Design a protein with these regions (language model features):
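Structural preference for solvent-exposed beta-strand-turn elements
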Residues: 1-278
């Protein structure tokens, strides 16, 4: 929605807490004449990193603590500087879940920023996963010998991210007793649980936003599962890693949207998987 204030020529953009739209609005308005206020802006780590990048290039961007970002027009940006891109905290969180379930003892994850992972680490610890801070953006995640069923509710940063509820559901499937997922931000993002049922997971979809998982489940392979969602596809791979027998996961192209060299990284850590072209 565009709300033009003709007295100050200030353009106010009211938006949802979406990461991509926030990033696009910031970039689109840096060199656009006038001042822009982006309301309900996302503040995820990669949004903050984009702002830091643009500030290094002499952009005039201010952040308010009520999810407002103010972009003031500049005539030109610098193109002569160096900048470090932050690691993806969703990718780091995915690997934390994988190693809690599938590692032999523990694994160290480098370039994992603790502040970005707070909401994830707290839920892993609540589920009895041991996580150690080795400092200098390095984490040690231990294989879980037992897991506690817990409730997760997705939310905007810094709370538990919607992009990790699918992988976390696989961890919940191995926990004792009942776990609950409450997906606040999206409808029908829990549909991947229908695919998980093919692997003999005991789940119940309550409504488009809530589901129960009754554990622990001994997942079985010899089935074909699919996904039309990047994070659900990662969840299916995690389920395959801990399941008995071979599993086939289709729509592999989705994984490349959010994970760098995902298959080979798992193979380097002794996962027995192969990408095939049917």
């Amino acid at each position: 929605i565009l709300d033009w204030n003709l007295k100050t020529w200030e353009k106010i953009l009211n938006w949802g807490f979406w990461v991509s739209s926030t990033e696009n609005l910031i970039v689109a308005n840096v060199l656009r004449p006038g001042n822009t206020i982006i309301k309900s802006a996302a503040i995820e780590p990669h949004v903050m990193n984009l702002i830091s990048f643009l500030r290094t290039a002499w952009a005039d961007i201010k952040i308010r603590y009520n999810h407002e970002i103010i972009v003031t027009w500049v005539e030109k940006l610098s193109d002569n500087f160096e900048f470090d891109i932050v690691s993806d905290y969703i990718e780091a969180g995915t690997y934390m879940i994988i190693w809690a379930l599938a590692s032999k003892e523990y694994i160290d994850i480098a370039n994992a920023r603790i502040d970005d992972l707070y909401g994830i680490i707290e839920k892993l610890k609540e589920a009895w996963v041991k996580v150690e801070d080795l400092w200098n953006d390095k984490l040690r995640v231990f294989k879980a010998t037992s897991l506690k069923g817990i409730q997760i509710q997705t939310n905007i940063f810094p709370w538990f991210p919607t992009d990790l509820q699918s992988p976390f559901a696989i961890l919940q499937s191995q926990a004792d007793w009942i776990s609950k997922i409450h997906e606040v931000l999206f409808e029908w993002r829990l549909n991947f649980l229908v695919e998980l049922e093919k692997m003999r997971a005991n789940v119940a979809l309550i409504n488009p936003h809530e589901a129960l998982i009754f554990g622990p489940n001994k997942l079985k392979g010899w089935v074909t599962v699919t996904s039309w969602d990047l994070r659900a596809w990662a969840a299916m791979i995690i389920a395959w890693l801990i399941a008995e027998w071979e599993t086939k996961v289709t729509n592999v192209e989705y994984i490349y949207r959010g994970y760098e060299d995902f298959i080979n990284k798992l193979k380097n850590l002794w996962a027995d998987l192969e990408e095939v072209n049917d």
